[in-house]
Amino acid sequence: MRRALNLIFLIVGVTLSGCGGSDGSSPPDRPPMNELRSTKLRATAPVVSSEDAATFATDNLAFSLDMYQALRSSQSGNFLFSQASISTALAMLYAGAATSTATQMADALHFSLPATRLHAAFNALDLALTTPPPKTNAAAFRLEVANSIWIQKGFSVLPVYLDTLAENYGAGLFEEDFAASPEPARDAINGWVADQTEDQIPTLFPPGTIDTSTRLVLANAVFFHGDWKIQFPKNSPNAIFHALSGDVFVPTMHGDHNAALWSGAGWNAAALDYVGDTASMIIVVPDAGTFAGFETSLTVESLSAILAGARPSGTSNVIMPRFSFATDVSLNDTLSALGMPEAFGDGADFSGINGARNLHVQSVIHKAIIAVDEKGTTASAATGVGVGLVSAPATLIVDRPFLFFIRHNATGAILFQGRVVDPSK
């Protein structure tokens, strides 16, 4: 296996089609693009009450669990996704939704706050995520978020929609001629994605996903690189991992860490910090033979209790496999099943974008790559589950399927999450 890149790339792409008619700044080293942008400046100090912040966090966790369960039913192996990335892209779309389309989206995405306060909460989260930790080398820790919207050339956009995007997401709209030249437009958008991911994801939109009916494309990219605060020794030996499909031998890291270790009924967990203490990886390992049941039984309350249980436990020993894999999935059916089918049909109402009901969602595409090694990552329980510290000796052996969460510590936001059922894949 080639040297791990220590990175995570999360990309969400959303395309909208028109029902008739033809109706961040330009990336470097590419031809300049025409950008439509509000005269409004980004709100750099959004006002979000503590109550709204708590509601926003709970809502996000609820959607992340819904998404996890939906992907679990359709993905047989390892998978990775980012609720933060998916929600941000769809929140930009939600800003233009109206009537029952908006109601369905709010229900499916767990957007319970009023629209103005919701967008302010997304803005506050984005600003918090992209604030670099003090006195930390960028080579050791980077977390970057980028949003872009691409619209049919000559397509009218309401000023209020542009204002919302500018003030809360720092985004404008790039013009492309999808109607006449869909392939060059697709190349331009894929080029933007490649720039944001340092060319690790060169083709977000494969041929055919953008065509002459496309009128609007939303893209959200998250780049994460984090060295472990305490790195594992190099040259990890092979060890057995009890995968769902049978035992495999995989490179397995052994290291002493000041990781938090804690446990509950049927599971053990660890939290490994990244340099700068801005983010941590939380690993949750269900008891042997209980992984499927643990996944199925997860609730917002039980998952909240698990994630809140991390506390310093002194020197600890963590034994875990190296792993790397990619996820590439269309979310159309998933989002429809979660309760927003109207957005994908001719009856969709995105009149908040252009003042007319002639847009619907064509595709929502999510791509992710993760690599975890000795250096770092560049990328069950009923309600009221009991949580307690693991007694000494403090050792967690991750030799069976597990869940992982990469959490932004200051906000508690889950940046990335997924499962590893076979690290050899």
Predicted features and spans:
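Sec-dependent signal peptide recognition
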Residues: 2-10
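Well-ordered beta-strand positions in beta-sheet-rich domains
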Residues: 78, 247-249, 317, 414-419
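Short Gly/aromatic-enriched secondary-structure transition segments
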Residues: 105-109, 232-241, 292-301
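Non-catalytic, conformational "gating/processing" segments within enzyme and secreted inhibitor domains
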Residues: 115-289, 304, 308-391
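Extended hydrophobic
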Residues: 218, 268-284, 392-425
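Short beta-strands and strand-coil junctions in structured, solvent-facing domains, enriched
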Residues: 290-291, 414
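Short, solvent-exposed amphipathic alpha-helical segments in soluble enzyme
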Residues: 298-299, 386-387, 421
